[in-house]
């Protein structure tokens, strides 16, 4: 998801706006909306723009390895989780949702006081939501995992088995 968040002081009030549409026409709309929002604020509390700190810790949330994960690898992991879950016990009847997803992006924060910070990030996650039925009762189980850097750290077998055990534990 990409977007731009904007805030500014107008008539001594802080106005906010946001858009996911990033083009030339959005700039004026962001400013106008922030001004309108500032005018509608009824509180008298003053807000200030943060000038920034002298030093920021480096946070590394980017992994080239995650960037290079292919869609085929993600699909393979999702199908594997589904198959494992369905083999845990005969009462596990259906996988409702199963996914393996990667994302990457960049964040920037800047203001008129000189603050300008940018960082890139990647992450990958896998999860499964399933249903078990013992003939009289139905229960669901869910499990997922997430990592910033190492897809290998996600144990798809463990995720599938935990979700199945959760559903089974809710039966009878």
PLM feature spans:
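Active-site bordering "gate/hinge" segments
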Residues: 1-172
